């Protein structure tokens, strides 16, 4: 139900504009199918923390079946992917999973997700291209 309340990006142009026009906040985009279970779970977490992170993060969702433009560029083969951008730059985060480009697993704790977003934002403000997650998700590695 959370995805209903989160802003949807309905075209490649909308995704680009969300990434390019946000000057001060971190842009968090959940890519995936709105009907996928893992997307629904992540959307609930993102919706529940949206008000708490509004000062430093803008959260969006993008249905990859509706907007396939970025599937190849961002390697969006997973059912659910969360990516971070700051001032038109892709932010990478080391979660201990081996894939630093994106989060392709569900974080089921609200405070953990807030901490991750805050860590990525702080690293982005310091011009770090890669930040280390405050939590190790090695056990959530997707083969």
Curated annotation (Swiss-Prot):
Q: Locate the coiled-coil region(s) and give their ranges.
A: none
Could you tell me where this protein is found in the cell?
Nucleus
Q: Which UniProt keywords apply?
A: Cell cycle, Cell division, Mitosis, mRNA processing, mRNA splicing, Nucleus
Q: Which terms under GO biological process does the entry name?
A: cell division; mRNA splicing, via spliceosome
Transferase in keyword set: no
Extract the SUPFAM superfamilies matched here. Thioredoxin-like
Q: How does it assemble?
A: Component of the 25S [U4/U6.U5] tri-snRNP.
Protein name per its UniProtKB record: Spliceosomal protein DIB1
Which source organism does the UniProt entry give?
Eremothecium gossypii (strain ATCC 10895 / CBS 109.51 / FGSC 9923 / NRRL Y-1056) (Yeast)
| Gene (name only) | DIB1
């Amino acid at each position: 139900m959370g995805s209903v309340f989160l802003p949807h990006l309905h075209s490649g142009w909308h995704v680009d504009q969300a990434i390019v026009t946000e000057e001060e906040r971190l842009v968090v985009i959940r890519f995936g199918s709105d009907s996928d279970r893992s997307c629904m779970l992540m959307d609930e977490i993102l919706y529940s923390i949206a008000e708490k992170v509004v000062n430093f993060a803008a959260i969006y969702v993008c249905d990859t079946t509706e907007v396939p433009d970025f599937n190849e560029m961002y390697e969006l083969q997973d059912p659910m992917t969360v990516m971070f951008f700051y001032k038109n730059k892709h932010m990478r985060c080391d979660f201990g999973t081996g894939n630093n480009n994106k989060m392709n697993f569900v974080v089921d704790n609200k405070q953990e997700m807030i901490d991750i977003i805050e860590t990525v934002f702080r690293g982005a403000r310091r011009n770090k291209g890669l930040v280390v997650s405050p939590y190790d998700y090695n056990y959530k590695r997707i083969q």
